[in-house]
Amino acid sequence: LLIDNKEIKDVRLDLVFVSQEVDLFDLSVRDNLCLGKEIPDKKIFELLEEAGLKGWYNELPNGLDTIVGERGIKLSTGQKQRLNLIRGILIDKELYFFDEPTSNLDILSEEKITNMIEKYLKDKTYVIVTHRQKLKSLCNKHYIFENHEMREELSETSILN
C-alpha cells in the first residue's frame, strides 16, 4: 500500500482515526469536538446542522458548554458517531481512516455524513472500512481484506454487485 509513492510502513502517519466505537470525554460539547483547537462557534454550528444535529443542539441546556459523556448528557450511539465525524473534520489532517463510520445511523443520517465527507475531505486521502454501499461510492479504489491481508482490488462492477 502506497502513500505519496512511499510504502505505508515507511511513512510517519499523521492521521485522523474515526471509529464506529466513539469515546467522549466528560467535557463540554465544544471541548469534545475541538480538542483544544480554537474553532469559531459558527463553524461548529454549521457542522452540527449538516450532520443533522441542530435539533439536538438546540435542546442542550448550556449549548456548546453542555457537558457530555459519563457524567453529563447521555447521547445515542448515532449522535456520538456524528459528533465523532465532526471532530475528525475539525482536526483537519491530510489522511483519514474510517472504521464503519455510519454503522449506527439511519439512511438519512448516513446520507448527511456521506455528503460531509465528500464536501470537507475532497482534497484529503481517506480509507473507509465499510459494508455500506453509499460510503463505498466515495472511494476510487476498493479492496477486499481477508485474514489481515489485502486479497484483491475490486472492479466497479463487482462493487455494485
Label each residue range with its predicted role.
Residues 9, 13-20, 127:
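ABC nucleotide-binding domain signature
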Residues 30-70, 114-115, 123:
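ABC ATPase nucleotide-binding domain helical subdomain, centered on the C-loop/LSGGQ "ABC signature"
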Residues 76-77, 83-88, 128:
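ABC ATPase nucleotide-binding domain "signature" region
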Residues 90-94, 123:
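A short, proline-enriched helix->beta-strand linker immediately N-terminal to the Walker B motif
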Residues 96-100:
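Catalytic Walker B motif of ABC-type/P-loop ATPase nucleotide-binding domains
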Residues 107-108:
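Helix N-cap at the start of a conserved alpha-helix in ABC-type nucleotide-binding domains
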Residues 118-130, 136:
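Conserved catalytic loops of ABC-family nucleotide-binding domains
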Residues 131-132, 138-155:
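H-loop (His-switch) and adjacent beta-strand-loop-beta switch element
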